[in-house]
Amino acid sequence: MLLIDDNAIQAATRQTILRRSGYFAIAALNPRRALEQFQNDDFPAEIRAVITDHIMPEMSGSEFVRELRKTHPHLPVMVISGLEEAEAEYAGLNVAFRLKPLPPESLLSHLRGLLAEDEEGAA
């Protein structure tokens, strides 16, 4: 999993939650750098899904997803935001939009659902 959040504490917390649940998780604080890593295939393992924040400096979550979709149109993406109205920015981008706060059990449940949908779509 790739976690993108400019808030280091949020990123580290979600990374810990995922790792304790058996997922390989990488945290990135900069969405532009994460895109570069995707383009250069610089991740140490296959990224099965992306979890991103919506509001970040330099590049918003919706800008990140638009760019990501150019090269990874089917990669499961979950967007987490405290702004309900932000969901409209993701129309047509095939993402799961979730509102903060998102408790650990909800994060994991939504992620399992995303991965299951992806596996069904690949079958």
Descriptions of predicted regions:
Residues Q15, L102-L115, E119-G121:
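C-terminal output helix
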Residues A27-A49:
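Acidic, metal-coordinating helix/loop segments flanking the phosphotransfer/catalytic sites
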